Amino acid sequence: MEKLREFHEFKIKGNFIFDLYHTLEYYESLWKRKKSKYEDYDVIKKRVYKLKPVLDTIDRKKFVLAHIDAVPDNFLMTDTGKVYLIDWEYAGMQDIYVDLAMFAIYTGYTKEETDRLIRLYFDGDCSDEIYWRIMAYEAVGGLLWSNWCEFKEDLGIYFDKYPETQYGYAKKYS
């Protein structure tokens, strides 16, 4: 988390905004079937969209380059202990706390593990507002990546329990 925090502190700016809701809809539009495999998908999607008005109040001028795909496999450590962050295909301008949420959901963290991750990132000092935003991003990210998985499944690519885990975050935190 120290390396991710250091990266965020550079406050790099760019032109592309990674829009979570747009990307969620994009992957849904790629499905060959017209309905999700999850029976309660429409209900969960509505709950996730209820978070949007609050998340939309975040000042986009404060967005900086976020990795978006901060999965543990994308943190490479050399023999000398130097850490590199690789695989930038999803990177874009976004609230930095999206990276914390994505790290937690990619790794299948429980709420307790996510809380520990947040404490590490903030050295124990995270405001309630930021904590809530991270949880909201877990919900949106969970639905986004479960939609991505459904698209991939249409192509014959399967991910074991990963889609259900992602969908579970959308259900739990929305």
Predicted feature residues:
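Protein kinase-like catalytic domain
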Residues: H8-I12, D59, A104, D125
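A glycine-centered beta->alpha junction motif in the catalytic cores
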Residues: E9-I12, Y26-S36, L143-Y158
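An alpha-helical support segment within catalytic cores of ATP-dependent transferases
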Residues: I12-I68, T80
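Conserved catalytic-loop position in the HRD/HxD motif
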Residues: D69, D87
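Active-site activation/catalytic loop segments of kinase-like enzymes and analogous catalytic loops
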Residues: Y97-C126, A139-I157, Y169
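Regulatory N- and C-terminal appendages and interdomain linkers associated
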Residues: A170-S174
